[in-house]
Amino acid sequence: MFLTLIAAIISFMVSAFTMPYFIKFYQLKKIGGQQMHEDVKQHLAKAGTPTMGGTVFLLVATAVSLLVNLFSIKNTQSLALISGILSIVVIYGIIGFLDDFLKIFKQINEGLTAKQKLALQLAGGLMFYFLHVSPSGISSINVFGYQLSLGIFYLFFVLFWVVGFSNAVNLTDGIDGLASISVVISLVTYGVIAYVQGQFDVLLLIGTMIGALLGFFCFNHKPAKVFMGDVGSLALGAMLAAISIALRQEWTLLIIGIVYVLETSSVMLQVSYFKYTKKKYGEGRRIFRMTPFHHHLELGGLSGKGKKWSEWQVDAFLWGVGSLASLLVLAILYVF
């Protein structure tokens, strides 16, 4: 536990120290910044804000974790577990980096196409499964203490889990500080689970990422001086999925990650309902003012028809939802 605290503090300090230099380099080179959605007018002033800040906190967390684990890992099983989680973080970070690079440096608005991104994500998921999950012999999901055997279909579950949550966190990263602190809340919860299970190597990895993310948040809270970009959000979502698998608590991510589930569900519902009503009535109708859900809250509160919410209000509400959901999971696991 002490080692985890030291690693978290080091990650925080290095991340917070290096981020201003990243931002300054970005501005001096006059690199194109984040593009804003025109439908949310209060965001237009953020156009040009440096992005790809996830590159910094991912490098910091990975480097500190590897350095500390070199002196703390005592068996090959722990080494395989940590290397598996780190590998999926790095792979998805590279995918996000490519996407950001094409948008910013090559001025390709779409970045990677949806098919290209999905293909790379699936390839990364397959590497994670065959190199780190399959050798462990895991082929079942732990649901409330019961083992649901999936056999070969566990492969498809892993792909769905990793790809799904990487994209879900990516959708959540839409306003200042929302994704970074939401992920911190999720990681703290998994840190508690790892501690109770005695998975101290996983706990150390979680601690380094929490520290690096908090260092990043010093510059990502409203008004944000930097955004994490796809390089950060895709990697963080994949990391959460991998940790839930490593701790054999896959189901918990549906509740711990309720914010990401809500954001993704809002997009899916909106698109499906719009297509259905357009086919039935000749014009598309919407359930939400705008998706993902955080934009709906910005434009009119919970009902979508009330007063506009500030970004801080949206953040506080969704962080609160995530915190309560995480406490519920811990209560289910260790109290009831």
From Swiss-Prot:
EC number: 2.7.8.13
Cofactor names: Mg(2+)
Subcellular location: Cell membrane
GO biological process: cell division; cell wall organization; peptidoglycan biosynthetic process; regulation of cell shape
CDD domains: GT_MraY
Main location (coarse class): membrane
GO molecular function: metal ion binding; phospho-N-acetylmuramoyl-pentapeptide-transferase activity
UniProt keyword terms in alphabetical order: Cell cycle, Cell division, Cell membrane, Cell shape, Cell wall biogenesis/degradation, Magnesium, Membrane, Metal-binding, Peptidoglycan synthesis, Transferase, Transmembrane, Transmembrane helix
Topological type in the membrane: Multi-pass membrane protein
Membrane-spanning residues: 3-23, 53-73, 78-98, 118-138, 143-163, 174-194, 200-220, 226-246, 251-271, 316-336
Gene Ontology CC: one annotated term: plasma membrane
InterPro entries tied to this protein: Glycosyl_transferase_4, PNAcMuramoyl-5peptid_Trfase, PNAcMuramoyl-5peptid_Trfase_CS
PROSITE patterns in alphabetical order: MRAY_2 (PS01348)
Main EC class the enzyme belongs to: transferase
Catalytic activity: UDP-N-acetyl-alpha-D-muramoyl-L-alanyl-gamma-D-glutamyl-L-lysyl-D-alanyl-D-alanine + di-trans,octa-cis-undecaprenyl phosphate = Mur2Ac(oyl-L-Ala-gamma-D-Glu-L-Lys-D-Ala-D-Ala)-di-trans,octa-cis-undecaprenyl diphosphate + UMP
Listed pathway(s): Cell wall biogenesis; peptidoglycan biosynthesis
Family membership: Belongs to the glycosyltransferase 4 family. MraY subfamily.
NCBIfam families linked: mraY (TIGR00445)
Described function: Catalyzes the initial step of the lipid cycle reactions in the biosynthesis of the cell wall peptidoglycan: transfers peptidoglycan precursor phospho-MurNAc-pentapeptide from UDP-MurNAc-pentapeptide onto the lipid carrier undecaprenyl phosphate, yielding undecaprenyl-pyrophosphoryl-MurNAc-pentapeptide, known as lipid I.
Protein name per UniProt: Phospho-N-acetylmuramoyl-pentapeptide-transferase
Organism: Streptococcus pyogenes serotype M5 (strain Manfredo)
